[in-house]
Amino acid sequence: MSVSKKPMVLVILDGYGYREEQQDNAIFSAKTPVMDALWANRPHTLIDASGLEVGLPDRQMGNSEVGHVNLGAGRIVYQDLTRLDVEIKDRAFFANPVLTGAVDKAKNAGKAVHIMGLLSAGGVHSHEDHIMAMVELAAERGAEKIYLHAFLDGRDTPPRSAESSLKKFEEKFAALGKGRVASIIGRYYAMDRDNRWDRVEKAYDLLTLAQGEFQADTAVAGLQAAYARDENDEFVKATVIRAEGQPDAAMEDGDALIFMNFRADRAREITRAFVNADFDGFARKKVVNVDFVMLTEYAADIKTAVAYPPASLVNTFGEWMAKNDKTQLRISETEKYAHVTFFFNGGVEESFKGEDRILINSPKVATYDLQPEMSSAELTEKLVAAIKSGKYDTIICNYPNGDMVGHTGVMEAAVKAVEALDHCVEEVAKAVESVGGQLLITADHGNAEQMRDPATGQAHTAHTNLPVPLIYVGDKNVKAVEGGKLSDIAPTMLSLMGMEIPQEMTGKPLFIVE
């Protein structure tokens, strides 16, 4: 008979943030004797679950996908926007071999460097600061012919806000003494995602042939003419920017073309028009053999260079457990099952060796305020049985209630959800202690602690950027460390289990055994 295992259990109370203010705070308003006692008597700390600490832009609220990726990875996992911001700030961007290689090859052959992308401060599909950095990279490396093809936004930015951005780039080119804005067109044409190829064709012709419906001497003049035609940024018609005596910027074989959008969905169609030999969306008037670089991978089947391929996460918590022949269980309701499996495993769909999974069906109700306890009783029953089974070295569980009921904006329901969770935590903590295991209780982001927006007085249904609790229950004498974040959880668990922490995990243990 094998020895019974004493599991390391991680319970993630989804959407269970920490907020001092009591007003409109479902967690404070709920009767939670169990969590109150644990917070009062057990080692605990507060950890960051939003913004830069989880790889999101500064002060941006956390979310479940990002939260679980960070929890399982044991390192900050940067989202594309933040990853690029960081790369540009520390100048790694300017040494990116794919970008520098494309620019150098074009420059050495006397060819042009074309840069295209959504000129926007919206940060949803792209960011104009990244495009500016690309212009600087091309100029620094000695490219003489630098052409910017600006797709205008007006959806993730105000409808008529492109002028200041275009001015900034025209001033930049003037200061460099080389390069120019060569075309402008609304994202409605250049960034279609619904196979409306007639739109994409207009953008393709503008770029490849330097032909459009309109022409202007400067980008700002072209934009003002569009406004006079009653076209907002998003719908600006294909406009060639070319002053008297300037050469045209039509693309030629051997030119470099760098696409500076980082979000894939609206970048794919125009990319395929340039890259796919068998492209049939429309009859291309000019097929041009450019050195095409995607900033990120827009689709696995688009075969061209990628400056920032998807980061594959090596030695996540789940993978490290498997490599060390440990058994693990992932358990949640339908609503958060993908989070404790796929996202916690760093985007890996298949389970690791020794990894079991239990899915509890979430209740079939229109909205969860109608059943705020959700399926927590059944989930707890299965979790307690797994803890007592002696089968698992570690168990990861997510209770969705705080988040799913928090999203409804119904305060009374959120209070009931939190009270249901308190009973569950009591059962789980008792089970863990009865087998000599260890338990960490935390959250992936906040939600239920802020049920009304103080600015508008309306229901607050979104996540928050507040910290989340972390509590230790177990027989080890530990001291909490301040200033933690979600990516410290995996190293904390490994440390409490007496295991080595892989070097890829840059997070730090938050409970030190004394």
Swiss-Prot record:
Catalytic residues (positions): S64
Origin species: Escherichia coli O1:K1 / APEC
Binding site for Mn(2+) 2: D14, S64, D444, H445
GO biological process: glucose catabolic process; glycolytic process
Family that this chain belongs to: Belongs to the BPG-independent phosphoglycerate mutase family.
Pathway participation: Carbohydrate degradation; glycolysis; pyruvate from D-glyceraldehyde 3-phosphate: step 3/5
Positions bound to Mn(2+) 1: D403, H407, H463
Details of cofactor binding: Binds 2 manganese ions per subunit.
GO cellular component, one term: cytosol
Gene: gpmI
Keyword Isomerase: yes
Binding of substrate, residues: H125, R155, D156, R187, R193, R263, A264, D265, R266, K336
Pfam families found in the cross-reference section: iPGM_N (PF06415), Metalloenzyme (PF01676)
InterPro entries reported in the protein's UniProt record: Alkaline_phosphatase_core_sf (IPR017850), BPG-indep_PGM_N (IPR011258), Metalloenzyme (IPR006124), PGAM_B_sf (IPR036646), Pgm_bpd_ind (IPR005995)
EC number of this enzyme: 5.4.2.12
HAMAP family: GpmI
Name of the featured protein: 2,3-bisphosphoglycerate-independent phosphoglycerate mutase
